[in-house]
């Protein structure tokens, strides 16, 4: 995975979040709930689309078309997801 430029986290932390999400089905329930909560907080009405962005290998374009949402909206939500992952509650 290469570093996503617009996200203010080092490549290692971005990779940690991305690869954790890609293993969603094998994760403990509390981590799955964290991912779902962050999708709801960062994605709002588009939380299902954001979940697909984070937990599948599909392109943002394909997900945006299927969910009738702009790509830029998903990119903003994805950025917020990454930032919130490390925020203390």
Predicted regions and their residues:
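Short amphipathic alpha helix immediately N-terminal
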Residues: 41-58
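Short phosphate-engaging motifs
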Residues: 59, 81
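Residues in the recognition helix of alpha-helical DNA-binding motifs
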Residues: 77
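Flexible domain-boundary/linker segments
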Residues: 52, 66-67, 80
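C-terminal flanking helix
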Residues: 82-89
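N-terminal interaction/assembly modules
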Residues: 1-41, 61-62, 67-68, 73, ...
């Amino acid at each position: 995975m290469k570093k996503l430029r617009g996200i203010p986290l080092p490549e290692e932390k971005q990779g940690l979040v991305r690869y954790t999400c890609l293993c969603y089905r094998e994760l403990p329930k509390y981590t799955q709930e964290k991912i779902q909560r962050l999708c709801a907080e960062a994605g709002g009405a588009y939380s299902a689309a954001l979940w697909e962005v984070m937990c599948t290998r599909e392109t943002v374009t394909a997900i945006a078309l299927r969910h009738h949402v702009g790509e830029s909206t998903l990119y903003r939500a994805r950025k917020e997801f990454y930032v919130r992952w490390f925020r203390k509650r």
